[in-house]
């Protein structure tokens, strides 16, 4: 008999035949349907498959998350490296700007200070060295006294020959015994004429001998007799340099008063091979005597683009010019 819990839908009923004809008993055989038998195991297998798939999915997600995390860590490291490099570049750029700005300001300040000191010194020298005469016997420039340490063997455009004669008179023991005071009125009344040596060459004006001295004629005669064969010192120069000295009247005793062309002439006459290439550069920058005295090797190399050897030579000549030795042999 089939249990009450089972239903006819889930079982297969089969009649069992009996071999006894008198027996009216009917027997049935009940079998469970195959679908119902395999139903529960299939559900279990499906659940296990779903669990495995879920585990695989979770593992894949975790693996991808780990990969993403590693990639983010690498990007973070690279960003740190880039940030350090950028900060280093910014610090270097800021340091260079600050250094250049500081040096520029310092040079500007020192340039103004040195320029002011040079102007004051030049004014003092002009006060000490200029004559007290109301008028000068030079047609173009006022005559200044020669310094004791200045070279006397080179004629300069700013000095007339009477200065050379006056220096010779001071050194002459015979003429030094007869000193005479100099008066502006006597000086303005006498006419200064050029004197001639025995060979007929004109050496200059005799105004150095007739500076208001009543005995100027006797002194002149004595001086011309004792020094008839003496000629003013000269320096062997090329024709170009001599022409430059004659044409350019702007080279004076004080380099701070030179014009741009006077500085160019100084470069040409000092060292033509090394300094002539700087002529156009000096003209373009309008470097006059004051600027020439303030030039340094740093300015020549960094701002003007002069080569090292040329800058060293020019600085050497500028130092000699400041010491008053640039015209010495």
Swiss-Prot record:
Q: Where is it mostly found?
A: nucleus
What GO cellular component term, any one, is given? nucleus
Q: Which residues form the SAM domain?
A: 258-325
Q: Where in this protein does the record say Phosphoserine is found? A: 138, 238
> Do you know which PROSITE patterns this protein is assigned to?
SAM_DOMAIN (PS50105)
Q: Which Gene3D superfamilies match?
A: Transcription Factor, Ets-1
Keyword flag Transferase: no
Pfam families of this UniProt entry? SAM_1 (PF00536)
Describe the family membership recorded for this protein in Swiss-Prot or TrEMBL: Belongs to the SCM family.
For this entry, the protein name equals Sex comb on midleg-like protein 1
Native organism? Homo sapiens
Gene responsible for this protein: SCML1
